[in-house]
Amino acid sequence: MSPPAEIQADTLKRFIAGWGGWTMESFFATLSDDFTQKPLPLSCGEPARGREQLYPLLSSLMTMMTNFKLTIHNTIHDPSNKAAVVYAVADGDTPFGPYHNEQAVFIWFNSKGDKVDRIEELFDTAFMAEFKPKFKKWALENPGAAAGRPPPANTST
C-alpha cells in the first residue's frame, strides 16, 4: 500500500525547497540513508551515486556556483507509484560563465513517503557537454571544495 499522498506531497515540496535553497543541509534533508542518484541519459555513462558519492560532487558545485536560482516549470505527482517528476531550469554564475541547465528529475519516495529514495536526473546534454570539462578542471584545482561527508538521513520529518 502506498503512503498517503499528503505525506509524499509534503516530501516533494520539501525536496524542491531544499534543492532551491542550494545548501548541502537543505538538499540532503529529504534524502533517505540508502538514496541513489542516477544521471541521465544513460548514454552519458555516468554511474549511479549514493549519498557518500554525491556529497563531494554537490559540495564542489555549491561552493563554485553563486546566484543559484531554480525555476520549476512542471511537477507531476503519482502517489500510487510513490513517484514524481519535476521539470526545472537551474541558473547560476560560475567562475567560467553562466550556468543554465534544463532538467527533468524523476523522484521515488520511500515506503513511508517521508524521504526521497531515488532520483534520476535527465540533464541538458548540450549544456553539460560544455560545462562538465570546465567543472572537472575547476574541481581538480580546488580540492578543498569537496570536503565533508553527508549528514545521516533523519528519519523524522
UniProtKB/Swiss-Prot annotation:
Biological or metabolic pathway of the protein: Secondary metabolite biosynthesis
The keyword GTP-binding is annotated on this UniProt entry: no
Entry GO MF terms: monooxygenase activity
EC number: 1.-.-.-
Protein function: Monooxygenase; part of the ergochrome gene cluster responsible for the typical purple-black color of the ergot sclerotia. The ergochrome gene cluster produces several ergot pigments including the yellow ergochrome secalonic acid and its derivatives, as well as the red anthraquinones endocrocin and clavorubin. The pathway begins with the synthesis of atrochrysone thioester by the polyketide synthase (PKS) CPUR_05437. The atrochrysone carboxyl ACP thioesterase CPUR_05436 then breaks the thioester bond and releases the atrochrysone carboxylic acid from CPUR_05437.
Similarity comment: Belongs to the avfA family.
Name recorded for this polypeptide: Monooxygenase CPUR_05417
Lineage: Eukaryota, Fungi, Dikarya, Ascomycota, Pezizomycotina
